[in-house]
A protein has these predicted regions:
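Acidic/aromatic-lined carbohydrate-recognition and catalytic surfaces
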Residues: 2-128
Length: 128
């Protein structure tokens, strides 16, 4: 018999992925997300609640997602793509303005999208 998580009190934290520490203009599912998850666990909390993570629409609001099934591509981790050898480690070097603590969707897009295209091209080439 499985235990329902709602049968007992739990504590957690609300942290949107865009707020996770990162160096590419926006938080993502890379090392920063693992740091947050580990910090939540170390604090004795058992839940990580996120705002919607769908592809953002006008105004870059998580509540204006253009799909309820997809994920915002900016939440993909360049570090993991490099670890999987889909992009070169040198592609991780970001301009200093992306390291600021405030999320900047436009600058993150300008930096990450060309790397996503390169990762896809490398994936296709490796799969052929």
């Amino acid at each position: 018999m499985t235990t329902c998580i709602f049968n007992q009190r739990r504590a957690g934290l609300l942290v949107h992925l865009s707020s996770v520490p990162g160096t590419h203009g926006i938080g993502d599912l890379g090392p920063g997300a693992f740091q947050v998850a580990n910090w939540i666990a170390a604090s004795g909390s058992t839940l990580w609640q996120m705002l919607p993570i769908g592809p953002v629409g006008r105004g870059d609001s998580p509540y204006s997602a253009t799909s309820s099934f997809a994920i915002e591509p900016l939440f993909l981790s360049l570090e993991i793509l490099a670890r999987e050898k889909l992009i070169a480690p040198s592609a991780l070097r970001a301009p200093i303005e992306l390291a600021h603590k405030k999320t900047n969707y436009a600058k993150a897009r300008a930096f990450k999208w060309p790397r996503f295209h390169q990762a896809f091209a490398n994936f296709v080439a490796m799969s052929a």
